[in-house]
Amino acid sequence: MHIATFPALAITALALVLWATVATHSSNTNSCHMSYMKPDMIAMTGFNTTQTPLAHKYSLHLYRELDVDLSREVGGRPVLFVPGNGGSMRQIRSIAGEAAVQYWHDPRRAGADADTWANGSTARPKSALQKLNTFAFGDTESDTEGVRGLGDAVTARDMSGDDRRDAVERPLSNGKLPSQWPDDLPLDFFTVNFQEDLTAFDGTTVIDQAEYLNQAIAYILSLYSSHPNPPTSVIVIGHSMGGIVARTMVTLDSYIHGSINTILTLATPHVLPPVSFDKGIVGLYHNVNEFWKTETVPGGKLEDTLLVSVTGGIRDQMIPAEYSSVDTFLPPTNGFAVATTSIPDVWMSIDHQAMVWCHQLRRVVAETLLVVAGETTEKVSTRLDTFQEYFLSGMERVEKKAQNASESSKLTLDTLVSINTPLTTTSNIIINDHSPNQLVKTKSYFKFPVLKASEINEMSRSFAMPVDKGKSLLVKTNMPLEDLHILVCRTNTGDVDTNGFSFLRYGSKSKGVRVGTDTLVCANVAGEAVAMPSSIKYATGAKIPEEEETGEDNDIPVDSAISSTSLSEYIQLDASSLSGFQYVVVIDNTMSETISSDSYLLAEMALPSDMAVVAAPTWWEVLKVGRFTIELPEKRALLTKISLPHFWSSLVAFSIRLSTSDSFSMEYQCEAKKSMGSEHDVLFAPLLMQYSAQLHEAKFSTNLCGGYEQGTRVAVHGGAPYMPLAEGRDVSGTELYLWTDSSSRSSESLSLTLEIDLWGSLGRFLGFYRVMFAIFPMFVFLCLLMIQLRVWTTTELFVSLSDALDVFVDFQLPWILAGSCAIPFVPHVLVSLLYPQMSQPGQFFLGLNGTHLWFLGPVSLVIATGIVVVLHWLLQILTLWVCQCYYMLGLAPIAPESPFSVRRIVTISFLLLLVFKIVPHQFAFMVAVLVMAMGAGKARVGRLMQSEDKDNKSEPCVVIDRNLINYTHSLLLLLVLLLPINAPTLVVWLHNMANKWHTPLESHHEVSAILPILLLVLTASRGIMIRLPQSKRAIYATFAFLAYFALFVLFHGVVHSYRLHLLTNGLCLCLLYLSL
């Protein structure tokens, strides 16, 4: 393969990666609803340079929701918002506006006087109708910004009636009423204008912001000093890199101990920095994580500090979800990480920017903050329980053992009565309509004294089911639990005062009558219910009846149907939890006129073996055909748990399809009737949940109908590249939970097919390895440079990069690709010899924690080679253009001369002085790149002039130094490959200059960091080539350094990319020695 054909392969690989990114991004539809608010930012002018010199650059503001919260004084509980990289202080307006609406539209204060709330607010009381009007249509005298969404500007009158009603009158989620808030105070949201600082690229900027915020918190708390029961801490919300700033605050000397005890982060990369181009940001991450790891233990400085990390999941194309995990530095007693797909009433993936404005998420966040704000003085366990209640799906506790007849769960006996009604018992309890004559499959008939609370009306229906030893109880319903009593009961053994309560129990008809006198003790297990989305009984793309009335297009894709469906509840109690109980009792108190015909309750007892399916295909078995199928047993339970122990890599995405084994498609089964062997319609469509313990991620996929034509995507969040593992934890596989209507299944079995999603996997590959595409080309270039130097030492001919690429592709690349396949198998101890500071395995090369994706190494190197080819072509065009400009200006070609003239010494001394005092060394690096580009272009002038002499048939008057042309071109490519590492810091400096902030960036003003590069550029641009030294030791030393440089780039360059600049300085010193 020669240079003429290889670029086609390389460029094709690049195009596929870019295509995969676009395809992956477009396939995940944003289902967030727009948020609306009326913001008013009040500048806190009292916090100025007398408190901190950073006030020259930053400013503190108080948020108020116009026409909802009219007070301009603080009087609630303080919350501080920290924007992320390039973020705005206005990003808090969605959450803050929602919190204000939820608090001030609380029915308890609808008619309250203004002076009844904290510290004498001047807000005038409004009626509910006035509040609705002012919120929806604005106040023309006071509103300067109108109602805005965090996207396009939206006027107040553009809000639909449903939006206004939802904004004001919707009930709070999780069933928690406003009267249950522990502290009847609003929230005071403070936000900071950081001038859109770029914190992802510079560690110094992060520390500056953290210092400013510590002083700001001291000032905020001082505002409450005259209030009764003043707060002593602030809740901090950080978006993106704002979460790292919040965590950095507690590590600084300026931090007031206890002033922060709750931190909520949204899409924050906690484990690894987004890019590792800056030494400061890499070191800061290491120091902050170590501090949190050592200080969150009992007795540590942060033992009472709570950290909750929320990630948007697969839709976040900027920050991989795995980077938001906290288990590597935080014990479970002090926080957790959760994906938005798990949060009840959200249940969807959210992109990076939408995390602060997505209506479904901000509603839950605001409600949670209102509750937690009153618990800031409580123990960390109390606040942790609150966040877990609102943010976790509940599947984490399905295996939790129920408390046997605990006092808190018993029904009070004096409120119970005994009724003696005919009751059908079976292994299943099925309720899916409200006709009194509904029958279920019968095994035996009992006259059973069903317990019934006094408020239950006489129209209630009662069902009972015996508890089978060794079986688990499974209950799924979409009926409101406040209208159902789901009880587990046992015969009283004398540990409960029965007050003479008794009942009669009859045996089955075939065994005659047996009379006994006993008492029952029951526990209500509704508290064990897990909320989840309903799975509608309509085929994919069908219309939902209740939404057809809106006239909107309600075609429902598989992955987006969650936002359009109602809730369902699931209860699971294992055999140990049911130990000692004899009966499961369901009392249905629902009214037929208030419940739709699609309402159902399904309860059954099932053996663990009926619920568990373990599929353990190897990666080779999957890769051979790209898919594998799991046959589900015919006698399956309501829930089927499918374990995939080998599927843990975050780099592989799957699509899942559900089908039947016979001619009936799954689409037909969802609409199936009794003709399929059922005695009633299908209660619900199959519901799938993917669960990841690391991120507490429960990703639901509803309405799995449509057979092979439709599928749902599954992205695993387990073993991510370069991710350190928490102590005592290993990578685990994937778990899938499938709920199907077991009561209506026919004889055919179901099969679940997992197929590798090629485009989704390529998109994940690019998301994790975007830094790799900027680093690995340096490895390819160093290999090319070694080829050029090897030829030069034997022939004194410095070949072109095109010739070196031919040699590299034909002879070296196949061996390198073969060797890269074996790198995942190299022991960690051997790799650490290149960089002893590497602490954990899986942080070298591609950061793989296993060997099954060994082929990614060759793929990455092929793409890196293609990038070098493209850059080589582009620089050829650039230098030819520069050469043409020199020729048109009549400038002479480059001629070797001493680089140390007085003028040049003065110029370079002045530039170094600027680096030492004012500009970062990255600025001098950019100057070096420009000088090298001009030098490489000027080196070609002689070739252009010789070509003209040939056209004029005259003797050539210019001697062409082809060695110099190739040498300067190679040096230019070397500097261009370093641009991604140096450009971000330069952008930060220019941003600071634009905001008139002239504080030097620490660690970026080292003269030694740029001097070797400047000297080499100065010599090469003046026509001075490298020469063969008399001693071969210098050549051997240069080759040894190049080999080390190349291996470091390959093994550690992605995680420690900032070190490439230092190694390039070493290479420049070697070439400079050969030049002089």
UniProtKB/Swiss-Prot annotation:
Keywords carried by this UniProt record: Endoplasmic reticulum, Glycoprotein, Hydrolase, Membrane, Protein transport, Transmembrane, Transmembrane helix, Transport
The enzyme's E.C. designation: 3.1.-.-
A UniProt-annotated Pfam family: PGAP1_TMD
Chief location of this protein within or outside the cell: endoplasmic reticulum
Compartments where located: Endoplasmic reticulum membrane
SUPFAM superfamilies: alpha/beta-Hydrolases
GO biological process, one term: GPI anchor biosynthetic process
Glycosites: N48, N119, N404, N849, N952, N966
Superkingdom: Eukaryota
Membrane topology listed for this record: Multi-pass membrane protein
Molecular function via GO: phosphatidylinositol deacylase activity
InterPro entries for this protein: AB_hydrolase_fold, PGAP1-ab_dom-like, PGAP1/BST1, PGAP1_TMD
GO cellular component, one term: endoplasmic reticulum membrane
Transmembrane segments: 3-23, 765-785, 815-835, 855-875, 877-897, 910-930, 970-990, 1006-1026, 1035-1055
Residues the record marks as active site: S240
Family listed: Belongs to the GPI inositol-deacylase family.
Function: Involved in inositol deacylation of GPI-anchored proteins which plays important roles in the quality control and ER-associated degradation of GPI-anchored proteins.
PANTHER family registered for this protein in UniProt: GPI INOSITOL-DEACYLASE (PTHR15495:SF7), NEGATIVE REGULATOR OF VESICLE FORMATION-RELATED (PTHR15495)
Identification of the protein by name: GPI inositol-deacylase A
Organismal lineage: Eukaryota, Fungi, Dikarya, Ascomycota, Saccharomycotina
